[in-house]
């Protein structure tokens, strides 16, 4: 079991459920816009939100946002240690830094002292795209071993000043590298791990890479908090994270939708119907399985374990529960009737 840290009112590691995070894409100086996005993230199921703090103007905006945020906030800091101190003093619930890029040890100690005093954990964020030149020369390129060595160097720097309230991330845009790095680190250390694939590309590729990388580790019991990085609305990152956790058997809340791939027997717009069901139920937290099947020949039987579902006919369909037919309706009435029954479950 990993160590446990507390980010605001959220526990990470130590046997706590895997925590979902995302990062805002608003300007931190846009207080109103940032708060609106944080509220949308919370509605979607996000538990911790991270914001970029690139300068003192952003640090002032971060302070205002902290005062009204419904979620614990992480300040993402690079290069300037004074920004980390300002964020810690402004109400940050966690600081994300790379100790190697904020200056000499005296500056690292200054950040550590403030975080220790205010009981604010630090995430050491190691990234394949920003490894120290010395490690790149040693390993030739950003290997898993290079990421892990960098992580331990940074951890040792925090520990030198008596700071142990930390978590680690070792991210790469290459899935096997990220997975191997996290496995290697976990075999040697019990600090909690923040896992994710970075710079994943277009949304479709990003979803696949994230599901493979994060999912592989979760199935091995590795990973205490996750962020799905997508070139998209951050809210979509949260929905993807929830789906990954559900697929890995680590999340019971929320609807599990199963549907057939369609074939020549399909006589309804199954693809459109599945998308409508998915959209309508995306914020439903009921732990149920909903089936949307293309035909009545195999639909109810194949989806016998579903709590409720639809099987399509030729311009009509039927609603079934646990494989048993409940109601036969015209196609246009299927979705409203299904949602009404789900509401009563």
Features from the language model and the residues they span:
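Catalytic alpha/beta core domains of metabolic enzymes, predominantly
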Residues: 127, 135-282
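Glycine-rich, proline-tolerant flexible connector loops at the mouths of alpha/beta enzymes
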Residues: 25-31, 42-68, 96-104, 166-175
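Active-site mouth loops of central-metabolism enzymes
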Residues: 15-33, 52-54, 71-79, 135-148, ...
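Alpha-helix-loop-beta-strand connector modules within alpha/beta enzyme cores
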Residues: 56-77, 110-122, 182-193, 277-279
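Glycine-enriched alpha-helix->loop->beta-strand junction motifs that scaffold or abut catalytic
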Residues: 69-71, 88-95, 116-119, 186-192, ...
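Hydrophobic or amphipathic alpha-helical targeting/insertion segments
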Residues: 82-123
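Hydrophobic faces of well-ordered beta-strands that scaffold small-molecule active sites
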Residues: 18-24, 49-51, 73-77, 95-97, ...
